Amino acid sequence: MLTRIVLFAITNLAVLILASIVMSLLGVNPTQMSGLLVMALIFGFAGSFISLLMSKAIAKRTTGAYVIDQPRNLSERWLLDTVSRQAEIVGIGRPEIAIYEGVEINAFATGADRNNALVAVSTGLLQNMSQDEVEAVLGHEIAHVANGDMVTMALLQGVLNTFVIVLARVVGGFIDSLLSGNRGGARGVAYYAIVLVLELLFGLFATMITMWFSRRREFRADEGGAYLAGRNKMIAALERLGINHGQSTLPTQVQAFGIYGGIGEGLRKLFLSHPPLSERIAALRVARQ
């Protein structure tokens, strides 16, 4: 956690320095933009962290997940025991375990605190995977929790949101001044229209950056699953996903933390939260050699 906070502070400082440089190049006095920077930080991080803090409740509600408090059968008992053992190995508190109705083979982890997270699996996963494969999937999700991926993603999204808000308004003001000759005066409708377009454009680039990081994070979680359950089991689980693949039906709020994120071609690949299964399997096989 301390490492992520330090990295977060350094990244924010870099964003503010870069914003100041951009403003200077565009002829904007950075000292007059302090209000914008404060506003951008507040709005940039508010949504990310509110979503993070509410992520468990949102995930349970949107998927209709049933949390296993007392196991009703041997399968649920095995799930609890397996997750407890894996959580102990990586040194985190045991997450809540839940099952949600879904024909697709998938699972996800979420939560703001690595010692109070949620791991959920679909009924489709339990019905179509062997116990070894399920163990590997659980290890993958436990690795997400242990790595603090949910917090890291929220921090990254907050930084990018801040950058988008600041840059759209600075560049928008510069363009508006060029078009209208209005330098430093009251802004008209054109300025706000330009800012809206720039926010959409910069937001697309920010999403691409977030999804690129998410794809890198999946390789690390696969390695975690291989460590906790065994490399062959992790490879077998991913191969099973490849046989039963399709578009992910998980809610958007938790899709990035599922074991499987769907497929895409061309430019759509840039907006996928997960790498192709073939690349993930190849990475595990190379690491085994």
UniProtKB/Swiss-Prot annotation:
Keyword Cell inner membrane attached: yes
EC code: 3.4.24.-
HAMAP family tied to this protein: Pept_M48_protease_HtpX
Subcellular location, record wording: Cell inner membrane
InterPro entries: HtpX_protease, Pept_M48_protease_HtpX, Peptidase_M48
Record carries keyword Metal-binding: yes
Cofactor: Zn(2+)
Family: Belongs to the peptidase M48B family.
Induction, per UniProt: Constitutely expressed in rich medium it is induced at 37 but not 28 degrees Celsius in minimal medium.
Superkingdom in the source lineage: Bacteria
Active site: E141
Any one of the GO BP annotations: proteolysis
Sample GO molecular function, one term: metalloendopeptidase activity
A cellular component annotation (GO) from this entry: plasma membrane
Full protein name: Protease HtpX
Pfam families cross-referenced by the UniProt entry: Peptidase_M48
Binding site for Zn(2+): H140, H144, E218
GN (gene name): htpX
Note on how the cofactor is bound: Binds 1 zinc ion per subunit.
PANTHER family, A to Z: PROTEASE HTPX
Disulfide bonds: none
Record field: transmembrane: 5-25, 33-53, 155-175, 193-213
Membrane protein topology class: Multi-pass membrane protein
Keywords: Cell inner membrane, Cell membrane, Hydrolase, Membrane, Metal-binding, Metalloprotease, Protease, Transmembrane, Transmembrane helix, Zinc
Chief subcellular location: membrane
